Amino acid sequence: MYELENVLRPYAWGSTTAIAGLLGRPASGGPEAELWIGAHPDSPSVALSPAGKRAASGSGGAHAAVPDDGGRLALDELIDRDPEHYLGAESVAAFGPRLPFLLKVLAAESPLSLQVHPTPDQARAGFAREEAAGVDRSATERNYKDAFHKPEMIFALTPFEALCGFRPAAESRAVFQLLAADFALAGLELPPLVPQLLEDLAQPDGHNALRTAFERLIAGGTDVSEATAAIVAALVSGAPTAPYQAELSTVVTLHHAYPGDPGVLISLLLNRISLAPGEAVYLPAGNVHAYLHGLGIEVMASSDNVLRGGLTPKFVDVPELLKTVEFEAVAVPMLSPETTMLGQELFRPPFREFQLQRIVLAPGAEPVPLAQSGAAAILVVSGSVLLDSPKGDLQLGHGASAFLPAAEAPVNVHAVSGATGTALAFAVTTALKD
Ligand SMILES: [Zn+2]
């Protein structure tokens, strides 16, 4: 088992305090958006052997170049040395010689871009196409960073606000009807975009209704930006919003962050969700979503393939986006945990690359078997735990994380003797076995 040093991504939307607070360490002073725990080649964790751990004590943060000495090695390089040992034969057969999942701590202070992730076939084909065309992998117009899909899930540690998947067209139409009534009541001229959207959304075929409304908005242009500004001006000056307060206050917030961006009104086509701490949602390919605010544990297939659909100053490839969006109204894909032995919770989304175990250990509690098929990763967000495998022990304090090779299973997670507080940890492994 290897303790890990992980890379912090300082995206501008990140909270400056939430990740440091969760992990019990000093804040960097800048935004701390995502902590990546895994072997994605863009930001691999560093695996520390006992010697490397001593050398690193007191240091922290990201390391671009990792020397292959002193007991420190990038996790992807470690796995490359013996994939079957670290990942297990079954995982290598299913996903190839790479860690199939990525665990993140995500802290959104302001909204992330509206986005969609591709299916496995779309990712493979898109990556091959851009490679063949010689598009630089770091180019702004590059869509596919790797050849893999990126289904994901988010577990809320704090109240967590998000947009997730299309609502039924009739529900979105009702919001635009309310806005039309607000303009009439105030004697304001209705932007022509609104009656056009009402017509789009009235189509009896729900797929067509969502598709035409989405296409009209994502096309952008002055019609969209002027209508957005007029709607926000009406809302700010007190237009009635009931019963769509949450949706319409989100419109105002998004417009302030990204004035006139197509994503501002696209938000009204999507489910507006508020997760309570302990709740989780999963996001399959084709689901249009955006995280708005909150701290969570995010797990995904190890990929960085994102097609953006707005709420971003970054490149938006509309034709490619339209190929990947699923224009179907969906119920919010909430993920209920299975309660396993000793009261532990296991979140199993319908993807084979990952499952998430929430491990709670009160002082003196019985040890908990780690759910593990193939490799696993664990992060301690409260208290301390002792990992006990047939090959040895590893104690992890508050904020520490570790990589657990397949060959070192089974692992039991113990409360640390003498601990006074409850320990809380999150562990990820593949979902190859039932
Ligand atoms: Zn996403």
Language-model regions: role of each:
Residues 1-240, 313, 318-331:
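Transition-metal
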Residues 30-32, 98-99, 109, 148-150, ...:
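A short beta-loop-beta micro-motif enriched in histidine and acidic residues
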Residues 37-39, 105-109, 116, 151-159, ...:
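Short, conserved beta-strand element in jelly-roll/cupin
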Residues 81-90, 260-276, 370-371, 378-398:
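A short beta-strand-loop-beta hairpin characteristic of the jelly-roll/cupin
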Residues 106-111, 118-120, 148-152, 158-162, ...:
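Ligand-binding loop in jelly-roll beta-barrel domains
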Residues 272-282, 287-290, 359, 389-410:
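Short acidic-glycine-tyrosine-enriched beta hairpin
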Residues 294-346:
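C-terminal, non-catalytic macromolecule-binding modules
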Residues 340-343, 352-372, 398, 406-407:
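Conserved short histidine dyad/triad with adjacent acidic residue
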